[in-house]
A protein has these predicted regions:
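Ligand/substrate-recognition segments at binding pockets and active sites
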Residues: 195, 313, 324-325, 334, ...
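Append "and occasionally in soluble cytosolic enzymes with long acidic Gly/Pro-rich linkers
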Residues: 203, 261, 286-374, 461, ...
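N-terminal lobe/hinge region of extracytoplasmic solute-binding protein
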Residues: 34-84, 112-115, 180-184
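Gly/Pro-rich hinge or "lid" segments in bacterial periplasmic/extracellular proteins
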Residues: 151, 159-213, 217-219, 338-339, ...
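Surface-exposed binding/hinge segments that line
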Residues: 81, 92, 126-170
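Extracytoplasmic/peripheral linker and loop segments enriched in polar/acidic and small residues
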Residues: 290-293, 305, 382-393, 420-486, ...
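Alpha-helical secondary-structure segments
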Residues: 32, 106-113, 140-146, 186-187, ...
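Ligand-site clamp/hinge motif
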Residues: 206-251, 289, 373-374, 382-384
Length: 508
């Protein structure tokens, strides 16, 4: 049976690599995880891909962790409290912890990391931490974060990349190359990376809680083809695979040596448009919101879900799940309307509109692109699909070398980090350079209160703006579908899609 891969050479390379994984090097205490992509960088300050977050979450503990229900729990900060005016957050830090190279973990290290995240020219966390005015080490194990204004998402930020602690001396010595060999404070430390093949981690010698480490090694293996991931899971060459193709679920369920783990996801898929980022923004789809509206009217989210995802996902037009507290019911998921699409193009003075859609070159993304291409053609759009590696796609989008690009976001518990990142003027994933000062004002107000009802009202006001301007089109929310060796113990899928390796083991 033919298995689709990137190229014949890529398949040969994967076969060679997987034979190596089946060798004595892959001992019983080695967890081998099949991933859908290669990480961009392993420096939490710079990275923007979910695969990078997945790997760095195993290497780098955060100041605040989350439990399987995504409730904040102690991490490297054992306790925290807000000041009465919500302008200062004080953290009590864990004692007896050290970085993977032996550097001490203390308040000075926390201050250095937070200052790096919010001020380094390379940092993609700077806009997320903009409300931080100062970070002060009160003593060796107490840190105070002072804010210029109340900032509700801060706890969520410290439970994300911005809360990951890197060893200051090692990171300063590495400079811009810190992501090539990151040194964190976490359960498994970096060993090596073979680009487009794997990242290898080993049990950290200095970890503060060794009782939770039941694996000697963790390998993240890059296999973009979902069916190929499943094939290697069945062959025993992998122990856990992410993003099982919905069309492969019956095969997985029918194998007594495997098990399925599934949960609704915070993550979603979307298309971003280049509105003002370099020469490629000068196109009808970038210049005119009526053309983007016509494009949305030409596609059918339900059809995409049924054809590509076997009905397992949730069609959506917003970054929050349908029916959730921050979803705007006044703007429900629109149905396909070809007549309206054609009328909008005519009103915009356009005949047929051509543009290039940049997509990742995994088979599932290709299928989504092909379905969209076919539907949009009926309305008057000539969509050229440009397939590329996910890292190359992100790099192209960062420099404005795109007209439209398909993206994935793993989702966050705080609504600000599901929308501001894409549409705020300084959003770190606002690659199309959309900017609406009235929208920024509303989004800013929503971060300054913790009142759910008030925030929901503000995010609905925001939705009325970005759904009209359409700098992005949300397509669907995912379900996390994992395949696992039946011998794997301790794995529990969570809505954020992260693998919590601590406590996991492989039975003999």
């Amino acid at each position: 049976m033919g298995i689709p891969t990137r190229t014949g050479a890529r398949l040969a390379a994967l076969a060679t690599m997987l034979l190596a994984l089946a060798s004595p090097f892959a001992a019983a205490a080695t967890l081998r995880i099949g991933m859908s992509d290669d990480p961009d960088t392993l420096d939490p300050a710079v990275s923007g891909s979910f695969i990078s977050l997945q790997i760095t979450s195993v290497m780098c503990d955060k100041l605040i962790e989350t439990d399987p229900q995504l409730t904040p729990i102690p991490g490297l900060a054992t306790a925290w409290h807000w000041s009465a005016d919500d302008l200062a957050l004080t953290l009590s830090l864990r004692t007896g912890a050290a970085f993977q190279n032996g550097e001490p973990f203390d308040a000075a290290a926390v201050k250095w990391n937070l200052d790096r995240y919010r001020s380094s020219p390379m940092s993609k966390r700077a806009s997320q931490l903009k409300p931080i005015k100062d970070v002060t080490a009160l003593d060796d194990h107490t840190v105070r974060i002072d804010l210029s204004e109340p900032y509700a998402p801060l706890i969520t930020m410290l439970a994300d990349r911005s809360g990951m602690m890197l060893a200051p001396l090692a990171t300063m010595a590495a400079g811009e190359s810190a992501g090539a060999h990151p040194v964190c404070l976490g359960p498994y430390e970096f060993v090596r990376r073979v680009p487009q093949e794997r990242v290898v981690l080993r049990r950290a010698e200095h970890y503060w809680d060794p009782s939770k480490l039941r694996l000697d090694e963790v390998q993240f293996v890059d296999i973009p083809d979902a069916t190929l991931r499943l094939t290697n899971l069945q062959a025993g060459q992998l122990d856990l695979i992410e993003r099982v193709a919905p069309t492969d679920l019956d095969t997985l369920r029918g194998d007594p040596h495997l098990k399925l783990a599934a949960t609704p996801a915070l993550g979603y898929q979307l298309i971003i448009f280049n509105l003002a980022h370099g020469p490629q923004s000068d196109s009808p789809i970038g210049r005119d919101p009526r053309v983007r509206e016509a494009f949305e009217a030409s596609i059918d989210r339900d059809t995409i879900n049924q054809v590509v995802f076997a009905g397992q996902y949730i069609p959506d037009n917003q970054p929050e799940s349908v029916g959730g507290p921050y979803f705007d019911p006044d703007h429900p998921v629109p149905h396909r309307d070809l007549a309206r699409a054609k009328a909008l193009l005519e009103a915009a003075g356009q005949g047929r509109v051509g543009f290039t859609l940049l997509i990742s070159n995994d088979p599932v993304s290709a299928q989504v692109g092909q379905v969209i291409q076919s539907m949009a053609a009926e309305a008057g759009f000539d969509v050229t699909l440009q397939m590329t590696e996910s890292v190359s796609l992100s790099q192209a989008a960062d420099r404005g070398a795109f007209q439209a690009a398909m993206q994935i976001w793993s989702g966050r518990t705080d609504p600000d980090q599901n929308i501001s990142i894409w549409v705020a003027c300084d959003g770190f994933l606002n690659r199309g350079r959309y900017c609406s000062p009235p929208l920024d004002k509303i989004l800013g107000a929503a971060t300054r209160t913790t009142d759910t009802a008030l925030r929901a009202g503000l995010y609905r006001q925001a939705a009325a703006i970005y759904l009209e301007d359409r700098p992005v089109l949300f397509l669907q929310h995912y379900a996390w579908l994992w395949g696992a060796n039946a011998k794997l113990r301790g794995f529990a899928p969570t809505p954020d899609g992260l693998i919590r390796v601590k406590g996991m083991s492989l039975a003999p």
